[in-house]
Amino acid sequence: EIISRQSIMAQLGISDARALFPCESAIKKVDNIFPRDVSIKVIQMLSAGNQRICLHGSGGCGKTTILQDVEKKLPKGSTMVVYDCYGGGRYLDSDAFRHKPVDAFIQLSNDLARLLRLPLLLSRSMNINYPKVFQKKLPSASSITASKAEDALLIIAIDAADNSVLAAQSQTPVERSFVHDFVSVGTLPSNVRLIVTSRSGNLSSLNLPPTFSLLEVENFKRTETAIHVSGNWDAPSTWIDDFHHLSRGNPRVQRYALDYSEENPAQALEYLRPNGKGLSQIFLEQFE
């Protein structure tokens, strides 16, 4: 008998993989990530024993990309699970909610199971305390991680956590985001780390305990803008100065401008003139 994905799902009594993985990540992998000082700082904090970190910054400053860079820099044998609260922008759509505790903790638990070969969390029941079940999985996940290498870490990251809270608060009646349960998880095994990311202006909505260390992700420095641009073309120094100024060093604004210019990257400045653009202005233009 051929063992297929469908036959396994049938044995588990499910017909749709979304029963096991209801909130798969929609995050796109970034190629050719260049090192930023903040990535190095995160690695230093994780290695020094900081178990709870919140990365915060303005929209488009590169928080999601920083997580990808951090994953590449983790000690040998480490594992990183990233929960995507943004969902490609669909986190407010009724058929794509990501804020509900049952969905989020099933996804997180089964991501751990998939990566570390642990038992799957299958049940959906009003009688299950999903945050508690998730926390009970951490010791075994920690042990498997430790068996891979002495310094190996297990990182569980919640990206764009503030969007999850926003989605929960937008419901009628108001609902609870899983983020508040996640940040309140109790004692962690020594090699487990929790990371959440958020826009700085929304930090208060996360209700972070004082055990979380805050680390701001700033926009690009001028030197970082130069490195970013070099992946597209060999721009003169004066052009880089103007591009950095008009984009305000925001990585996502720069990406939109460079994508707009397509095969003529020098035209990226025209996209930002005369006074520069922020993310909100770019989004408004896309809807017009």
Regions found by a protein language model. Name each.
Residues 2-5, 200, 210-213, 234-280:
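Amphipathic alpha-helical "lid/sensor" segments that cap RecA-like P-loop NTPase cores
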Residues 3-44, 120-121:
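Conserved adenine-nucleotide phosphate-binding loops and their immediately adjacent elements
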Residues 8-10, 27-36, 59, 269-288:
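Winged-helix-like regulatory helical subdomains adjacent to P-loop NTPase cores
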Residues 50-68:
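Walker A/P-loop nucleotide-binding motif
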Residues 66-155, 161-167:
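Post-nucleotide-binding-loop coupling segment downstream of the phosphate-binding loop, primarily
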Residues 86, 159-160, 192, 196-201, ...:
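A short beta-strand-to-loop transition that corresponds to the Sensor-1 phosphate-sensing loop
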Residues 146-149, 153-196:
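Conserved Walker B catalytic segment
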Residues 181-233:
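The catalytic "switch" region of P-loop NTPases
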